[in-house]
A protein has these predicted regions:
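Phosphate-binding active sites in nucleotide-utilizing proteins
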Residues: 207-257, 272-274
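Conserved acetyl-CoA-binding loop-helix of GNAT-fold acetyltransferases
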Residues: 104-121, 270-274, 280-297, 302
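Acyl-donor-binding surface of acyltransferase catalytic domains
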Residues: 1-11, 84-184
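Ligand-binding pocket scaffold of soluble enzyme catalytic domains
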Residues: 57, 67-68, 80, 122, ...
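Active-site beta-strand termini and strand-to-loop segments that position acidic
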Residues: 71-73, 171, 239-241
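A generic N-terminal leader/anchor concept
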Residues: 1-29, 273
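A short beta-loop-alpha structural element at the N-terminal edge
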Residues: 18-30, 187-201
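Conserved donor-binding loop and adjoining core beta-sheet/short helix segment
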Residues: 25, 34-123, 131-133, 144, ...
Length: 303
């Protein structure tokens, strides 16, 4: 949780740069900034131009108020930050980076201050509009990778603490794929537009008490299914034949550009879920086995 501070969010920002909200005209420079940082920091994944264009399309988190871009005297983007928050959510999420050549000058600290103040403002706005579950305590959640010690030092110095770890697991596809059969009455089908809404509802149900998860509305789900890297041909849904109810789903993506830099190609399972009433029937195992077969057939090295 973050305490109260009575200031405009932009007052937190470092005056070495000129600050403005991100817009369509900034897409190339914004993407180039993130790519420069990624070349040095080597994250597992980073946002590219198409991802940033999707961010600008959000109506739940309008870019004019929820993004900030810092440019130098030549107009080159050197730092950015953004937050997202669901209207009835109990937290905001913060994202950002500083050009490696401009780090160590207090710019990241200023961005963090901006994120915190925007989080306070978003919670206050939700409370003013009568959202019952917004909660009185503003909370900002940040993510970092283990090798990014400079980020850890910044966050810890500002009073943040580690609350959750995530692991990314890989499996070679050349060593054979396990067999996993669905029981009678269940059917595996392709994931297409006709199932988008049913899978959204199934996902919200499956993750309703999962740590840190919040329901996804139509806009948020649209960003999932229309993600620039989304691969519906590598995804699948399990249906209960008698009712047509979604019994499980596996939504996958493929980062062809990232594969070139990593030296191997992979199919990535972004979301895997089984609603409660269908658990314990081997559905997740069958979906993962199907995903590996799809990835292998597409010529990928790993899952």
């Amino acid at each position: 949780m973050i305490g109260q501070r009575g200031t405009d969010a932009r007052a937190c920002l470092n005056p070495r740069l000129t600050w403005r909200s991100a817009g369509t005209a900034d897409l190339d420079g914004w993407a180039a900034l993130i790519a420069r940082a990624a070349a040095v920091e080597q994250p597992v994944w980073f946002e590219r131009r198409a991802d940033l264009a999707q961010i600008l399309d959000s109506t739940n988190n309008p870019a004019a108020a929820n993004t900030i871009l810092g440019v130098d005297g030549d107009g080159v983007a050197r730092a950015y930050g953004r937050i997202t928050k669901n209207r009835d959510g109990d937290k905001a999420l913060g994202f950002g980076c500083v050009d490696p050549g401009w780090q160590g000058q207090g710019i990241g600290s200023g961005l963090l201050g901006w994120m915190e103040q925007r989080t306070r403002e978003r919670f206050a706005g939700d409370a003013a509009s009568g959202q019952p579950e917004a909660g009185p305590a503003p909370r900002l959640r940040l993510h970092m990778e283990q090798q990014h010690r400079h980020q850890a030092a910044l966050f810890e110095g500002a009073g943040y603490r580690m609350v959750r770890y995530y692991n990314e697991m890989h499996r070679p596809l050349a060593i054979g794929i396990p067999e996993a059969e669905l029981e009678a009455g269940l059917e595996l089908v392709a994931f297409g537009p006709e199932l988008h809404e049913a899978v959204r509802l199934a996902h919200n149900d499956a993750f309703r008490d999962h740590w840190g998860s919040e329901p996804r509305d139509e806009e948020a789900w649209g960003f999932v299914v229309h993600d620039p890297l989304a691969r519906p041909d590598l995804s699948a849904v399990v249906l209960e034949r008698s009712s047509g109810t979604v019994a499980g789903y596996q939504l996958a993506s493929h980062d062809a550009e990232g594969a070139a830099s990593r030296g191997f190609s992979e199919g990535y399972t972004d979301l895997l879920g089984v609603p409660r009433e269908f658990r314990g029937r081997g559905i997740a195992q069958a979906l993962l086995a199907d995903a590996m077969r799809r990835f292998a057939a597409a010529g990928m090295d790993k899952a």
